[in-house]
Amino acid sequence: MNKYSIPANALITVAGTVGVGKSTLTAALAERLGFKTSLEKVDHNPYLEKFYHDFERWSFHLQIYFLAERFKEQKNIFLSGGGFVQDRSIYEDTGIFAKMHADQGTMNPTDYETYTSLFEAMVMTPFFPHPDVLVYLEGSLPSILSRIEERGREMEIQTERSYWEQMYRRYSNWINEFDACPVLRLNIDEYDVHDPASMDAILVEVGKVISKK
């Protein structure tokens, strides 16, 4: 246990839409706690760039890849005994991304059924530790779009604004119904990852949420 009342074996998951600052906050929180990080491997994803050029052709491949990578990370967290801050949850894969593409017809129904069946089988295994708290990052759509622009990933910048708008709406609906673990909601304009006092304040709140479990 530390000064924030966060157990040494805790799993803290950071969630939120693309560009909201999950990876940056994940690293900052892990550093303050002396925890390990579980980061999304975007740079070495063999499908991501192809997906942004052709959603219908590559949506299933991309989501299966993410699911496999996420499950390997979950198993690693389990075998390591916890003490992790995780960048993006496996729940977002199925609750946001796969469902969005199934709903808009860029993932066919058979593929979506296969995907959800595999997801459900994975979360039933003992290798699947549920987060002690999900830290949900939210903010205005203009702020998030500005961050996507500043990040400078060409495949994201070239994606139509309507795609990000739809994802933003789906995230807002998803988090209001999410109940797999306790949730702490943070506005991205109300903290500074470079300010130790700001990070301490967040971790105090994380500790309070975990203590109420």
Regions found by a protein language model. Give the residues of each.
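Extreme N-terminal, non-catalytic leader segments
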Residues: M1-A10
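Hydrophobic anchor at the beta1->P-loop junction of P-loop NTPases
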Residues: V14
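P-loop (Walker A) phosphate-binding loop of NTP-binding proteins
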Residues: T17
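Conserved lysine of the Walker
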Residues: K22
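Conserved substrate/cofactor phosphate-moiety recognition/catalytic segment
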Residues: E31-R70, I96
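A glycine- and Lys/Arg-enriched "phosphate-lid" helix/loop adjacent to the NTP-binding pocket
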Residues: I96-R170
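NTP-dependent small-molecule kinase module
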Residues: L145-K213
